[in-house]
C-alpha cells in the first residue's frame, strides 16, 4: 500500500523533522529573526549506567522566548518540583548503551529550537559504537508488520516463516537463521527505525543489519514495546532491507517481533509495504502478497479475426529461478509458456479454462468440460483448479537458459458452438505438439493476447527475475501475417495497491522485444498502464502449417 504521511503523522514527526541545530527563526508580525540557544555545560551529556540526575542551562538569544522541554524516551524524566532543566535518568539494566533526547521547543509555536542528547552507558560501563537509541511513537509513526514483509535469507528460501501467516512457524530459538524485512521509502533524509517486540521468557539481544551496519538491541519483558534501532541517513529513495538475527537469550526464545516502526524525513513521501489492514481482509492475502507482483504485457491486436499468435522467449541464466512462470502466449481463455517448477523441473505449460466457473474441477458438468483432442510426445494431460478450472497439459522437454524458444497457439471456432485451442513449441530444431483442447459453449478467435511473469512461491520472492519476449506476430484467419509492435504494461493487485513496488517493463530495441522484470526488491519501477512500442523485425515466421496439423497424437 502507498503509505503517505497524513496530517497527524506530520504533526507527530514535527519534533524530528526540523534541524537539530541550536537555533531557528521566530516570526513576530512582519519581523523574522533567528533564535539561537546557548546550552551549558554541553548539548551532549554522558551518564553512567546506574543513572542519576543531570542538569543544564539553556539561554535563548531572544529573552522573550519561553521554552518547552519534551523528552523522547521514558527513561529520561523531569525531576518533580524543580526547574525543567533538572532531569532524572533511570538505571540502564542492559549490556548495551542507549541514547535519548530532550527536545527544546518554542513554547508558543512548538518549533524545535534545539535538543540535548543523553548517552547512557551500559551495565558494563561501555558505550557502543552504535548506542541504542530510543524513540517514542511520535518519532516513528509508521508501522511495518513483520508478517507480509519478511523472508528467510539465511538459509535462503527456507521454511521457518509460515507461507500463510508470514510469521515464524515455531518459537524463535535458532541464532543461525536470518530473516530480512523489506520496505520502500519515497524520500531522502534521515529515517528513524525501531523494532516492536516483547520477550515473555526473559531478555535477549537481537542484531539488526541495515546497509552493512549492525545494531544490537535488548528485548525484554512480556509487554510489547518500541525499541529504537538507529537514525539512518537515506541518500536515495527505494527499498530498505533490515536483517534480523538472534545473538543471545536468557530464556527459551529471542522474543516475538511483530514489526518495525519508521519515521523522519525519508518516510514523508510514498512508502510501499504490505499493511496489516490488507492482510486481515482475506486469510490468503499474506500468501499472495509475499509472492510479489506478477507483471504483464497486453499486446495490441489488429481489428480482424486472429487465428494464431506467435511469440519468442529468452530467459538468461541469472533469471532462472524455481517457482517461475514465463508465460508466452496468453489468450482470453487460457495461457501457454515455459515454467521452472518449485522442484526445479523445466516444463512447458498449456492450459484452457472451462466455461463453467468453479475452482473445483470435479464440480464441472460433463457438457462443460474442456476435452482433449490431441496430445504430443512427452506430454502429460490433467485438470487444474484454484484459479478457475479446466484442461491442462505439460510438455517435458527441459528448456535451457540462454536459448531462444518459439511458441505458437491457435484459437479457432469449430462451427458447432465450440472453439479448439492448439499449442506448439519449437525446440531441438522442430515444432512439437503440446495439446489440442475443445472448449464447449465458446465461439471465438484468438483474443486478449498477453504475456506475463509470475512467481508462485512466496519464499522465492526475494530473487529478481526478468524475461525477454520478442518478435510477436499474429496470423489472421485470412492467412495474412501481421507484426505486433505495441504492448501495454500492467501488474496484478499486489502491485496496483502499492504493496510491492519492485516491478518494471521496458523495450529491448536490439532484440525487437519487450522485457518484464519483477521481484527481488529492486528499485526499478514502471507506471501501470504505460504503452511501449518495440522496433519492427519485418520478418514473419516461416511455418509449415500443414506439417503442424499432421503431427500425430500420442496416446
Where does each model-flagged region fall?
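Sec-dependent signal peptide recognition
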Residues: 4-12
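Bacterial Sec-dependent N-terminal signal peptides
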Residues: 13-44, 110-138
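Surface-exposed binding patches on compact interaction domains or structured appendages
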Residues: 36-41, 56-87
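Short, solvent-exposed loop/linker segments at the N-terminal edge
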Residues: 45-50
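Extracytoplasmic
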Residues: 77, 123-398, 406-413, 417-555
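Surface-exposed, short loops/turns at beta-strand junctions within beta-sandwich domains
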Residues: 90-97, 233-236
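A short beta-strand micro-motif common to beta-rich folds, especially ectodomain repeats
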Residues: 97-108
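Short, exposed coil/turn segments at beta-strand boundaries within extracellular/luminal domains
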Residues: 107-114, 251-254
